[in-house]
Amino acid sequence: DVRVNDCYPGHEFKIDSSTEFRLTATATYPTDYPTRFECIVNGEVVKNATIQSIRKSPSILLLKLEKKIEFDSSSWMAIRCTQKMPNGNISFAHSAPFFFMKQNEPIRPRKVEAQYLLERVENEIRRHQQVLTPEQLEGYHAARKFYREQLKVAR
């Protein structure tokens, strides 16, 4: 269960310079395997989130996260749980994002994200150039233009 000010993921909050929010999140996991519970803001793990672990039974662990959060720019936030399984695979759950919007300010992507997506689109253009018609490539060209613009405003 993940909530901000008792609202569920997907909610969009309006922010100003003095808005504080209360994040609460809980997850139940088998304790046989290492588990991480993380608060993600704009794609990066928030380092100062405190996690409380409560043993519900010999094999079940309840993880709780409570945090006061503030944003000085438009942002998104989500919660992620990961667990390393004995076979080496990673099991994970990720909430939908909450949105915190400052008036007239879009959420700016990180440079590394915009660059990665631009490179992916350019690779797809190269890969399909000999196969698709110019009309069929228009969507890729529009995406390339979009990610080039995102790269200019990225943080």
List the predicted regions and their residue ranges:
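C-terminal functional module detector
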Residues: D1-R155
